[in-house]
Amino acid sequence: LRDWWGLWEADAYPRMDLVVASLDTAYTTKQENDPSALTVWGVFSGDAASSIATGFVNRSNRMRNNEREAARFDQGAKIANLLPDDPASTPRIMLMYSWTQRLELPELVQKVADSCKRMKVDILLIESKAACMSVAQELLRLYGREDWGVQLVNPGANDKLARLYSVQHLFSEGVIYAPDTTWAEAVIGQCEVFPKGKHDDLVDTTSQALKYLRETGVLVRQPERIAEINDSRVHRGKP
């Protein structure tokens, strides 16, 4: 799994289309427990054509690009004509930031809020389990008017290992990047030894974020995107 991470060597991150934070809560300082953990992930387009297609898919069948391209689509051009057959057009994911720390509830809420503000997060993901509800409620009560929103995520019936396996293909396809930092190494290291490592808090946040992005259609690969758009244009009569 380590070899599948792409190394981001540039000094700055690219412009992100979406920034998602993923939280695994503990809000206890007991040393025998996993600490709370937060990872921040950015989605960025491979090229301009990807932005065109993404804008179409994610905005209820309305093109956000210029009028010329919109006219081409209205005249019956396939989206494949706008999106070159290039792997670079697949959206990429960047691990932008992470931390782990044992904190009581007030300190945890404050640190999460500060992180979301500093990283310009759009959505904060929190697992919808009983242990996380107090954190979610406090964040909504104190920071409900901030630019970032809180999204509760149902993990479903799958266990932690199954959830990570469900997004493993994203790593093998080479679309996930991380900078050369100590905090990024902590995330990569936990993923590498999972499920045999001492802690798995960062792994949980990783699978939660990637699974959310995949299931909400943000991380759609080029062939899937073309098929979806072309399929949406097929006229279906009444049964």
Labelled PLM ranges:
Residues 1-25:
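ATPase catalytic-site recognition across NTP-hydrolyzing enzymes
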Residues 7, 210-239:
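Acidic two-metal-ion nuclease catalytic site recognized across multiple nuclease folds
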Residues 26, 129, 206:
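Anionic group-transfer/hydrolysis microenvironments
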Residues 32, 118-121, 176, 200, ...:
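Intrinsically disordered or highly flexible coil/loop and linker segments, enriched in small
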Residues 37-39, 44-194, 239:
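Mg2+-dependent endonuclease catalytic cores in nucleic-acid-processing enzymes, primarily RNase H-like
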